[in-house]
């Protein structure tokens, strides 16, 4: 059915985005990246036990009338200094035949970034500490899943594993923005029939990196990756 086909393509676009982002964000030297479902974060925050005013669950945010992104969060960790540095890079993914959803997607991911800035960045207080530990635990959980599935190099896993206690004690610096400023504070990734393109634009006072990926190219990327994984598993 058309709906099922669209859902499959939507899921494939998430996988393709993760693959593309690992390469794209990899240009920031010394940062190891772990993909996390934003939907999962929004779903679980309600169970932390903080007052409702502090939560950024979907229901709480809908009540404020602010559309947010619930697709993907790339969390980066840099362990080159004594105090680890952590980066948050939210990503909204839009899959369509044309560019009709891009304006809405830019606003969604800009709102998500502003929410992180408000609840996580700045001087440490009790609420920010709780949230930072929660995000760190999500990073470590996803890293463990990736390790179990052979999707993360041993060296990368071991480096983050060494600072597990620091992460879970909020003993890290949460960095605002990436070393490469042109990548913006968040990203909108669109899949359509248009050409591949990258540009940074200001949406709601937030620098958003808009990446357009040609859909046939995306499917070829996935096929090449699947073939590579098959070769690895057979070797």
Describe each region flagged by the PLM.
Residues 1-45, 105-106, 183:
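Nuclease catalytic cores
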Residues 95-100, 194-198:
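Short acidic, S/G/P-rich loop/turn micro-motifs used as interaction or catalytic elements
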Residues 24-30, 96-185:
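Acidic, metal/cofactor-coordinating or nucleic-acid-engaging core segments within structured domains
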Residues 146-235:
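Non-catalytic C-terminal interaction segments of nucleic acid-processing enzymes
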Residues 34-84:
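Active-site metal-binding core of divalent-cation-utilizing nuclease and nuclease-like domains
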Residues 72-76, 86-97:
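Conserved catalytic cores of phosphodiester-cleaving nucleases, focusing on short active-site segments
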Residues 6-14, 61-72, 101-112:
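Phosphate/oxyanion-binding active-site loops and adjacent basic polyanion-contact surfaces
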Residues 35-37, 89-93, 184-192:
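Extended hydrophobic secondary-structure segments that form protein cores and membrane-embedded regions
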């Amino acid at each position: 059915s058309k709906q099922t086909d669209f859902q499959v393509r939507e899921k494939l676009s998430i996988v393709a985005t993760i693959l593309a982002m690992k390469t794209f964000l990899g240009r920031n030297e010394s940062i190891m990246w772990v993909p996390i479902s934003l939907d999962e974060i929004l779903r679980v925050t309600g169970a932390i036990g903080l007052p409702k005013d502090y939560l950024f669950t979907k229901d709480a945010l809908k009540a404020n009338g602010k559309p947010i992104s619930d697709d993907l969060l790339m969390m980066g960790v840099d362990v080159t200094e004594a105090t680890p540095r952590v980066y948050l890079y939210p990503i909204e993914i839009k899959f369509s035949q044309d560019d009709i959803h891009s304006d809405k997607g830019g606003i969604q991911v800009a709102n998500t970034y502003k929410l992180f800035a408000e609840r996580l960045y700045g001087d440490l207080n009790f609420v920010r500490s709780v949230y930072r530990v929660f995000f760190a635990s999500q990073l470590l959980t996803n890293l463990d899943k990736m390790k179990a599935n052979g999707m993360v190099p041993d060296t990368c896993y071991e480096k983050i594993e060494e600072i597990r206690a620091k992460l879970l004690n909020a003993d890290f610096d949460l960095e605002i923005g990436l070393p490469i400023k042109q990548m913006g504070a968040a990203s909108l990734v669109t899949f359509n029939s248009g050409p591949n393109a990258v540009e940074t634009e200001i949406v709601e006072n937030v620098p958003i990196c808009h990446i357009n990926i040609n859909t046939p190219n995306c499917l070829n990327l996935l096929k090449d990756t699947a073939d590579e994984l098959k070769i690895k598993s057979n070797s």
